[in-house]
Amino acid sequence: MKDILVVGKIKEGQFPKFMGFMKSDEGIAERRKIADLSKTIGTVTPDQRKVMFKIAVHNMDALHAFLNGSNPVSKPVFDAVMESYEIHELNQL
């Protein structure tokens, strides 16, 4: 497993829709294909325009598909809510 930091920029007013999907049964099922959900840590900026998640990823290809629109489950939601995202690999010093 790799520790990954994902930073996403959310379109204005779309945070509730984003979180609704992430907490839905459908969203959770897709996220389980990517990472160990028990190790996920998330936060959001006060204006709800940026989110940050530290995740323990076991399938990097699935992570990229989830974020870039090639996953058919996440694509409709992410097309509507995401402006951009960054993926960073974390290394322990």
Model-based region annotation:
Residues 77-79:
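Short, exposed beta-strand-loop hairpins at the edges of beta-sheets
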Residues 1-73, 83-93:
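Short S/T/G/P-rich N-terminal loop/turn motif that feeds into the first structured element of a domain
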